[in-house]
Design a protein with these regions (language model features):
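Nucleotide-activated chemistry modules centered on ATP-dependent adenylation/adenylyltransferase
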Residues: 1-36, 43-383
Length: 383
């Protein structure tokens, strides 16, 4: 039996939701700046997108006058189950938007091939990312998203970015969110992108608020949010946000994200997925753990050259040993072989519809070009 207190809480939540959706409509109608919604496929960005959709759908069609772009960033090394889920969702969003006459289009951005993870790690020999040398975030996440936003700014003059971030997630995030607030408005200035503003409609939500909204409200594009909940339970994870500046925390704990991430000691989300039945992903976990082992101070010199990429040798202070440079060419060839073997194993055991390319053909071509020009690999080790 439902208590009076629970009934009152439900009524207050419904009332708050009505007020929030009215607020969203007011912000939408206040100017001609198009919206760009950052969508990672996780609970927070799904909640924000669903809220925006339901609020704007309540407007007359003639009032839905400015475009809303749903932007998803694929690093090309995302966990395969997440990539497939997002691809299916983006297709469903575009189909539903067309059916409902919504001004919404969904698209995915990816890194430039020359900036991709494997081109840098296997092609150029960059060591696996670490807290001290996290070369990946800007190349894989920030730059592709920012390029899209800059193009929209060039086209429209200014844009408003909708981010599904919550101040309760961390003190750092709360501080960043309040730092650039524009007094008297719902918007903040973007910290690095001129012409871009930020709107955070679920800023005050708790994690319970997010799940309550998702499980009590049907997805406008007819996805089942219980599937999203099941995915979280299987991975016991958070989500990697769309990262558009260096102040926004990227992944680095138990979150959905890049399966190659070595910034953390253990990939708890991937381990949990494997333990909960997704054992076809185990070759990825094994390869990720090998990359992490190359950061072991006692073993670094097994894998890395004593010279930098430009041929110089660098010492720190009075140290007698040099700072390790890129991965040795012979180890890069070994890594490529292991990556292609992992791809074969994963696809041989993947459930129907879950097959994936761990490395793109274009990346292999760029690796071949780099190896020929920098290593004199005319024997073509890539083939």
């Amino acid at each position: 039996m439902t208590s009076n207190n629970e009934t009152d809480q439900t009524k207050r939540a419904a009332l708050d939701l009505v007020v929030l959706q009215e607020h969203i409509r007011a912000v939408y109608a206040a100017d001609d700046r198009p919206w760009v919604i950052g969508y990672s496929g996780g609970k927070d960005s799904t909640c924000a997108l669903q809220l925006i959709w339901s609020a704007i759908r309540a407007l007359p069609e003639e009032a839905r006058r400015k475009p809303i772009f749903v932007l998803s960033s694929d690093t090309l090394v995302e966990t395969p189950v997440i990539v497939n889920y997002i691809d299916e969702t983006l297709a469903a969003i575009n189909a539903a938007a067309a059916d409902q006459n919504m001004p919404i289009t969904a698209q995915k951005v990816v890194p430039e091939i020359s900036d991709s993870f494997w081109v840098n790690l296997i092609g150029r020999g960059y060591p696996a990312p670490s807290k001290r040398f996290r070369w990946c975030t800007e190349r894989l996440k920030i730059d592709p998203a920012n390029a899209f936003i800059k193009n929209r700014v060039a086209e429209y003059g200014e844009v408003v970015m909708i981010l599904g971030v919550r101040s309760s997630e961390s003190a750092t995030r709360a501080q960043v969110m309040s730092l650039h607030k524009i007094d008297g408005t719902a918007l903040s200035r973007h910290s690095t992108l001129p012409g871009a503003f930020v709107f955070t409609p679920i800023e005050t939500f708790s994690v319970d608020d997010v799940w309550a909204f998702l499980l009590q409200n049907q997805s406008p594009w007819e996805s089942d949010n219980r599937d999203l909940l099941a995915m979280y339970r299987n991975a016991q994870a958070g989500e990697c946000p769309l990262v558009v500046d260096k102040q926004t925390e990227s992944c680095g704990n138990s979150r959905f994200g890049c399966w190659v991430c070595t910034v953390v000691t253990k990939d708890k989300a991937m381990e949990a997925l494997v333990e909960n039945g997704e054992d076809w992903l185990e070759p990825l976990l094994d390869l990720r753990d090998e990359l992490a082992e190359t950061q072991n101070p006692e073993r670094k010199r097994e894998f890395r050259d004593f010279r930098r990429r430009d041929g110089s040798v660098t010492f720190v202070g009075d140290a007698e040993t040099s700072i390790p440079g890129p991965y040795l060419f012979k180890y890069r060839k070994e890594l490529l072989r292991k990556l292609l073997e992992a791809q074969q194993q994963v696809n041989a055991n993947a459930p129907p519809g879950e097959k994936t390319d761990l490395i793109q053909i274009e990346e292999l071509r760029e690796i071949r070009r780099i190896w020929r020009s920098e290593q004199g690999d005319w024997g073509d080790a890539v083939s």
